[in-house]
Amino acid sequence: MKALIIDCLASGDGKRILARDVIGAGPRTVKGILQSEGIEAKITPVEDLDIKDIKKYNLIFISAMTSDFKCVKKLVERIRLKTDSKIIVGGPIANDINILEKIEADISIVGEGEITIRELIKKDFDAEDVKGTTYWDYNEDELKINPLREILTDLKLITPSTEIKDYKNYFSARVYVEVVRGCSNFKRPLLLCTNKKCNLCENGTLKCPLNINPGCGFCSVPSVFGYARSRDEEDILKEVEALLKEGVNRIVLSAPDFLDYKRGEKLINPYFPEPNYEAIESLLSKCKDLADKYNANVLIENIKANLFNEKVAEIFSKYLKTPIYIGCESGDKNHCKLLGRPTTPDDVLKAVKIAKKYNLKAQVYFIYGLPGENEETAKNTVNFMHKIKNYIDKITVYKFRPLPMSAFQNFKPNITKYSLLIRETANKINLEIKKKYIGRVLEVIISERHFRNKRDAIGYLPDSGLMVVVKDGAKFIGKTKKVKIIKAYEKYLEGRILKTWLCKY
């Protein structure tokens, strides 16, 4: 039996525009499960798929996000014209339990796949009575929805493949290694509570009398993946080293909140206990040793501002040269409470000031068009962006999307002129920050040809996700070069490769 895993993550309408340097953990995890059960498997990004090769495979897995719906729908239609192989859809797109009524696949895997896929293999992919799946019953011509599966407690079952060369850009990509699964924020968005008040889940609770899904209202992680739990250090290090041996240059230690790592058992309290400093330092120090050994970089991603303090910053500054990503979402304190946020804008301001003190580059996330957003909250968010801009390296803004299994799944984006003001302010601040790079010489991993000008190339900084358009750089794909920055834009930089003789000075 042979399986093809098609990576559609962040492909939107069919072509990945943003985050082209990201290789998520999901498809590798699926490949590892299949290989552990004796099934030959290959990953292909959707852009690299040769549809004629589909006939070679008995099983077609598709990994996608909710925003990739159009891409997946068109892809499945193309596959159906070529083969009758079983099509299984997974990833966040499958959190919509009715997805098979919209996409002509056979099975969807809702949530974690480690046990579900193994059960499907044992049953020759007959999904009847397999928890965590929906499937199309062709005899009755209807969608069947099985009960959700309990969250995975044995994280030893997470066995990702490290055969990373399925991805052509593995050498320049940020390759995600799962460290923590699930989230510790089991508060509820007060926007959905009667009188906008509740004293039951101030610090998080597993059960809600109103059956409101846990976590920030816009996020589905607690509902899908449960409370935060951590992989063993030895398993993480084994995976990291195997990827570095394959030639990966940038590893991201992936977690909804890295500071939840080994913080406790069954974490549903985003405030207590405090971070496990010893475990964090042990993991980062050993990852840094591996990165130094293979001349690579190890990055972390998300952290909660309320858990970030000087002790954490001191540890990070010893082992990391990379940005840290902090969610703020709204610059209005009351709005944050309504959203179910564990942190306030004051927490974020304190965190970015600490980061600056320890020479850590902070990047802060915001969302516009959120439920509860109004003129006052939007203006407070804009003012807060200006308050933090001197302490940060970037602002990232997203448009609110209602995600299946999130508390706000039935809301629609509330886009007003004040919402757009949030986006416009972020763009202006980002341009202002990026202009500071003009004239600097930076090391850039040159990844691929530019979409329009084939003589130019797209590259990335080794220690971040910052994109650089390298003029006349196409002949250096796969190499790391010193690039002098000559222009700055809202989302990327532009530069030229230094002449070899200049690199000495």
Curated annotation (Swiss-Prot):
Lineage: Archaea, Methanobacteriati, Methanobacteriota, Methanomada group, Methanococci
UniProt-listed Gene3D superfamilies: Cobalamin-binding domain, tm_1862 like domain
Domain Radical SAM core: 193-440
Residues covered by the TRAM domain: 435-499
Keywords: 4Fe-4S, Iron, Iron-sulfur, Metal-binding, S-adenosyl-L-methionine
Disulfide bonding pattern of the chain: none
Name of the protein this chain belongs to: Uncharacterized protein MJ1620
Naturally occurring in which organism (per UniProt): Methanocaldococcus jannaschii (strain ATCC 43067 / DSM 2661 / JAL-1 / JCM 10045 / NBRC 100440)
Chain positions recorded as [4Fe-4S] cluster binding sites: 208, 216, 219
